Amino acid sequence: MNKAQQASVELRAMDELAAQDSPMHRLSPLSKLFVTVLYIVVTVSFHKYDISGVFVMVLFPLVGYQVSMIPVHTCFHKLRVVMPLVCAVGLFNPFFDKQIVLYIGTAGVSGGVISMLTLMMKGIFCLMASFLLAATTSIEDVCRALRQLHVPKVLTSLLLLTFRYIAVLLDEAAIMTDAYRLRAPGQKGVHISAWGSFLGQLLLRSMDRATALYESMELRGYHGEFHYAQGRPSSRASWPFAIGCAALIVLARLYNLPVLLGGLFA
């Protein structure tokens, strides 16, 4: 199995995750989208030195993965390429902010180290929450929720078509890669001299597939907007869940819960 086929399999695995049945899957897409967006906005709003406040925000995705019965390591495996890039964003902070803001015993910790860790946690937690939404909600349900929020139909259609056509593009790339390997069995990968013709052929093949797909969509009544069918019945607990989560998220932002809990047991 070449890399294009592996990517296609992983992409289709997201649809399989979204098709599972759990209390989290049965919540309405709009409520999950609302909570996820609120969680991301609140998480990134923490001060760069508020590491204890940011750390509390890990509870939402962790509880969400437990309720949805999706292992947490699945998230880290799927996002194994993106997470190191997110963590790398704050690597230079210790070199620019060298002021000591915390002492652990006799060892001083600079503000750059604190802000680096805070930024890393923000990125990881937001990715975990976003993956939780994608793993428990199909792309059709996400787009339907966006339309309920009056997001322009052009954007929702573009999002849905892009997501669906990526799988088609990967299939075409896998076919071409296999054909190239049959013609050059002893060669590892595509030689640099063939990159131009390979990409050009991939472009032509993808344009042909796109034309065929669009014509078939028009034959089925597509006129610039998708009419989303009602998915699985939503749980009655959808909006109580959303309101409860929103209240807890805002509470965690307004009050430093670790400090409050520490004061109770001091």
Model-derived segments and spans:
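Interfacial helix-loop-helix linkers and transmembrane-helix boundary segments
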Residues: 53, 71-79
